[in-house]
From Swiss-Prot:
Residues covered by region (Disordered): 1-20
Segments crossing the lipid bilayer: none
MF-aspect GO terms: double-stranded RNA binding; enzyme binding; identical protein binding; pre-miRNA binding; protein homodimerization activity; protein kinase activator activity; protein kinase binding; siRNA binding
Job description of the protein: Activates EIF2AK2/PKR in the absence of double-stranded RNA (dsRNA), leading to phosphorylation of EIF2S1/EFI2-alpha and inhibition of translation and induction of apoptosis. Required for siRNA production by DICER1 and for subsequent siRNA-mediated post-transcriptional gene silencing. Does not seem to be required for processing of pre-miRNA to miRNA by DICER1. Promotes UBC9-p53/TP53 association, sumoylation and phosphorylation of p53/TP53 at 'Lys-386' at 'Ser-392' respectively and enhances its activity in a EIF2AK2/PKR-dependent manner.
Major subcellular site: cytoplasm
PROSITE patterns xrefs: DS_RBD
DRBM domain ranges (all copies): 34-101, 126-194, 240-308
Key words, A-Z: Cytoplasm, Phosphoprotein, Repeat, RNA-binding, RNA-mediated gene silencing
Protein name: Interferon-inducible double-stranded RNA-dependent protein kinase activator A
Amino acid sequence: MSHSRHRAEAPPLQREDSGTFSLGKMITAKPGKTPIQVLHEYGTKTKNIPVYECERSDVQVHVPTFTFRVTVGDITCTGEGTSKKLAKHRAAEAAINILKANASICFAVPDPLMPDPSKQPKNQLNPIGSLQELAIHHGWRLPEYTLSQEGGPAHKREYTTICRLESFMETGKGASKKQAKRNAAEKFLAKFSNISPENHISLTNVVGHSLGCTWHSLRNSPGEKINLLKRSLLSLPNTDYIQLLSEIAKEQGFSITYLDIEELSANGQYQCLAELSTSPITVCHGSGISCGNAQSDAAHNALQYLKIIAERK
């Protein structure tokens, strides 16, 4: 789909020799070129370089829609497509149809250059890219893929991949790691596409729940625990840092994961990482004479970091 607005008649394309060279003849002479390339050549020779701008990007469903506007001289046209390149292609085509004096000339889009997902078999879509665009559109963290299982005989391997997106998780299986990853992404897209438009906002709230604890929200939180942390010294003996961090996490809406490191430190101590699901994610290291001590040290370091962040203005 494309729309155009013709402000003024464009000047004919001048050749370096005598006479004029119409845009229609340029297209006929170079049939292998796309509308974007032809329009760029036209703009270069007339000193009106095409300028493209993205007007709309809708990736809430598994087949995204983009709208691009192109301006060349006094002509402005828009085009829509399921990819940015396809939308630009259609905008350029609409501009060319106005610029050329001849009858409408249609362009065939080379399949390898600009495939239209709506006309492709399902197995040729790019669900991984579509899911990533969906996450970016909503401001979520990017999907994370983990190979969880690999088995089967050498001639018939099967891979299992887990895809995590905020608080959701889907599993995909395939004969290759890439196929398993694609299948997991497809399951996510199918889940989101089955949700009615009026529920998109509530879904965003559910998926984005773990994004609730940001540095901005920490600094401005009226919560009792976080404000107590701002006044605490964090150096008092017999303080249960793990419990204190757990209370703050519950109040501020983030989770804590303690990851024990198998290797001992250079001085022979146990090591641990405390991962906080804040936005951005916080990871703090700890060490001690036991696993418990290492976790407590990691919690202590995390509290010190949160205290610094919360006190900043």
